[in-house]
């Protein structure tokens, strides 16, 4: 399988990671300057927590969705599709899971390519045709191929610390908690958290574009994924609101985020639907000319 490269997209992702790295470097310097060893101990503990979260991301995500791993004799067709697409993507076959939910969606999780899980909802299986389902599964396998769980965990780590400092930093300032430098550090942390939040969301959107492109490379059929995205989007209108609320915390994982009127474009984990469809159609035209 040949992965087609969108150098503009790669450049935007690299630039976003560069900005995050520079921001975090300055942030760590500020923390070391303003806080004593107590804060550094907390940073080490939070680093350990992030490692636990990283290594057990698949179990946490499946539990959050109420999903269960399924054997080939339980979901033979789903297993066959994922096995064939994994071979086309040059990936080990991931663990297969199903969540009993009316919300038509899917996600991939796991710390690396050898420890990945692809989960689909029963609502997704009922909603899509075989070709459309393969497009969605290929999108999730592209996330695995691109190591997106690892990338986003690394990108989010110091943002989480910045949020912690904003909430609880004054507790670790000792006798200096009322001094101006401590409050300057908290304000700096607030700025770092807001800016990094927006950069991480931008990175997430870029990686969705990359997964769409990867899915097209795996299947050779961008129109199937485009059709699946439109069908899922329409189906969301008929899903009970309580089901959507129950799964809103999984937005960043899903192929299509659960809608929320309070989330603006800058804070969204996914690109606008029309933009994704447009890029898939452009990719289809590009493939037809090759």
Task: Say what each PLM segment does.
Residues 58, 82, 120, 135-143, ...:
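Active-site recognition of the HExxH zinc-binding catalytic motif
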Residues 91-115, 216-290:
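Active-site-proximal gating segments in proteases and membrane effectors
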């Amino acid at each position: 399988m040949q992965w087609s490269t969108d150098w503009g997209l790669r450049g935007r992702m690299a630039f976003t990671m560069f900005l995050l790295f520079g921001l975090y470097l300055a942030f760590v310097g500020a923390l070391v300057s303003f806080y004593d060893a107590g804060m550094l101990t907390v940073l080490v503990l939070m680093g350990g927590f992030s490692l636990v979260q990283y290594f057990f991301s698949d179990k946490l995500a499946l539990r959050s969705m109420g999903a269960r791993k399924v054997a080939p004799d339980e979901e033979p067709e789903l297993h066959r599709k994922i096995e064939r697409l994994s071979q086309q993507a040059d990936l080990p076959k991931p663990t297969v899971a199903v969540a009993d939910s009316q919300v038509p969606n899917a996600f991939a999780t796991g710390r690396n390519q050898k420890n990945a899980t692809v989960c689909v909802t029963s609502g997704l299986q009922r909603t899509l045709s075989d070709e459309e389902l393969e497009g969605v599964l290929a999108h999730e396998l592209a996330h695995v191929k691109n190591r997106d769980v690892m990338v986003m965990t690394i990108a989010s780590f110091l943002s989480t610390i910045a949020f912690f400092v904003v909430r609880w930093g004054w507790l670790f300032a000792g006798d200096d908690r009322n001094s101006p430098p401590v409050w300057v550090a908290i304000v700096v942390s607030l700025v770092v958290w807001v800016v990094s939040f927006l950069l991480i969301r931008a990175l997430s959107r870029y990686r969705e574009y990359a997964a769409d492109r990867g899915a097209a490379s795996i299947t050779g059929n961008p129109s199937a994924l485009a059709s699946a995205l439109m069908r899922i989007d329409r189906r969301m209108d008929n899903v009970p609101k309580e089901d959507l609320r129950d799964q809103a915390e999984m937005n960043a994982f899903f192929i299509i985020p659960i809608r929320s009127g309070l989330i603006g474009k800058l804070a969204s984990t996914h690109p606008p639907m029309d933009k994704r469809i447009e890029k898939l159609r452009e990719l289809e035209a590009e493939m037809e000319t090759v």
